[in-house]
């Protein structure tokens, strides 16, 4: 039924912990494909799991997107699921999704909500994806309301037909793939309103300068490829500011406030002004507002 694709680089302990967590799945209708992205120390897995585990090692570093594409090519099952080595599936995810597919066999793409854990701040919130009938470029250019790769399942044949993930991008690969899905005339989507993935987020973990440079390049690429109408231009202008604000917000930087204020000037939404003020006063408090916004 499923091939679960896990890209990993120099995180052997996390890979082993992830595999242990998958033992708790209520059904074992899946294989796991670990794509070792040319780590200095190769991933080694002992064959003691109640499901098949395959390990493939890239000869050169391909990045997360390229490694997921490699895993997709190696997959032997009809459906692809994606999991990062520091995230988790709900214990019933594979069972719930397989039951949904049996009920709606015409679909080729499935997505669901997620439980997001803010590790340092010690709180959680849940994503709210849009309904399938609202999936279009206008909506996804305004905000990625499909989610990242751990919130998606896709038929291998559809994934290959779409060209997989863009391995040239160093940022926003998940978002660009969501736009690719939304833009496809062959999309047959299904939605499960359950948080079937648990994603962990850490503030002050990454480089602001590197992230900003890569993200700005990705934004430029996405705008050139997908923005065609005036409405799409307006929507993506707002979302681009939000994407850039997120980098600073996750690093607890007051610079996030300037981006939220720019969003407010475009949206005239008092919520954005409120977040701008809170971000300037206390970036940490602004992160905690995710509980409510």
Predicted regions and their residues:
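Short aromatic/hydrophobic "clamp" motif used to bind/position activated sugar donors
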Residues: 80
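Cell-envelope/extracellular polymer assembly enzymes that use nucleotide-activated donors
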Residues: 1-3, 21, 31, 176
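Catalytic core of nucleotide-sugar-dependent glycosyltransferases
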Residues: 194-203, 207-235, 254-266
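Conserved nucleotide-sugar donor-binding catalytic segment
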Residues: 131-216
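Flexible acidic/His/Gly-enriched loops in nucleotide-sugar-dependent glycosyltransferase catalytic domains
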Residues: 66, 94-158
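Acidic donor-binding segment of Leloir-type glycosyltransferases
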Residues: 19-57
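A conserved hydrophobic helix/loop-capping motif in glycosyltransferases and polysaccharide synthases
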Residues: 2-14, 18, 25, 35
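Glycine-rich, basic loop-to-helix element that forms the pyrophosphate-binding segment
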Residues: 58-75
